[in-house]
Every structure is written in C-alpha cells, then in structure tokens.
Amino acid sequence: IHEIQFGYVERPTHRSRGYDQQRFEVCNHRYTALCDNSHGCAVLNDCKYGVGVEQNSIELTLLRAAASPEMASDQGEHRFRYGFTAWSESFAQAPVVQQAAAFNDPVWLEAGSLQAFSAFSTDAANVVIDTVKRADDESGDLILRLYESKKADTYFHIRSDLPVETLIPCDLLETPVGRAAALKAELHVRPFEVS
C-alpha cells in the first residue's frame, strides 16, 4: 500500500508479469506499508518519494542522480529522515496515516502553558483535515479541505473550539454544493472522497 495524495493505492508485491518487472520503483507520499488482515508495518518518509517493493522487502531510493534532463540533479548535500512503524490489527484500524502526518509535521515544544485548544478536528480517525484556509472570495469564511484516507464509507462530525455555527459544503473551487448544516450535524464522505 502506497500513500498518494488524498488516499492510497495498492500494488502487487510480486514481479511475475512483464509490466510488474518494469515497475521496480513507484512513487509514494508519506508511507509505504506491507500488511495483511491482522498486522503490518510501514516505512515513513519526509521527503524521498521513490520506493520499490518485492515480496516482503521495501527498497528506498535516496538519490536518482540522472544525467538527463539536468546534469546536476540530486548533487549536493541532502537531509532526510525515515521512520518505521508496525501494528497488530488490520490496516483499516492502524494509525499509520496519523503517524505519517506526525512524522512529517512534528510537534514543536515551547516553554510555558496554554489551555487545550483545537481549531478543528473530526471524530473519525480516517477522515483527515488536510487544509484550513481563508476563502478565495475574501469573504472571511474558512475553508476546510478534508478527505477519507482508508477507503471506507464514513459518517462523522467536525468539532471546533472556534465560534463556528454553520457548515456549508463546497467543491474544490469553493462553490457551495449543498445546504448549510449546523456544526454538530452528522456528515458523510465516500471512500477516498475529497470534501
């Protein structure tokens, strides 16, 4: 399983067909996982997106150093991190998406104290809030871009410590596409849906 933007793609771990042999390296975003119905493991990365999987091995591409189209590509100093995580449950129940996000955007600690505050969160672990931004129309509205990350039809709620009362569904161009709902309303996303 390889993470892609707003979801994942499953690819075979064998090279028994001709086109599988040519696919010795594929891209991923923050993780690549090997798993079955009861357990699994994943390699997490923060900036290197080439990976090869064969049987039970994951190979990582650190540098390409191709001579074309740029003679000096990948030359110089590189900094990157890899992590490893494992779980003893199905992939659908595993926290790998959250672990990959935390690995890529670690928490920074500062001295002092603050009250607990969460601008936005969901009550479904597989529904990820990817973006919070001001609306392009300069109305002052906030846009939440979220997606379903585990290929599961999901009902969920959004929670906020901000004074938000109403949600208005919109498409990726920020055009309203549904009726306004109260913040406490139950919402729905289809598998891998971006909302």
Q: What are the roles of these predicted feature ranges?
A:
Residues 1-195:
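C-terminal (or distal) subdomains of carbohydrate-active enzymes
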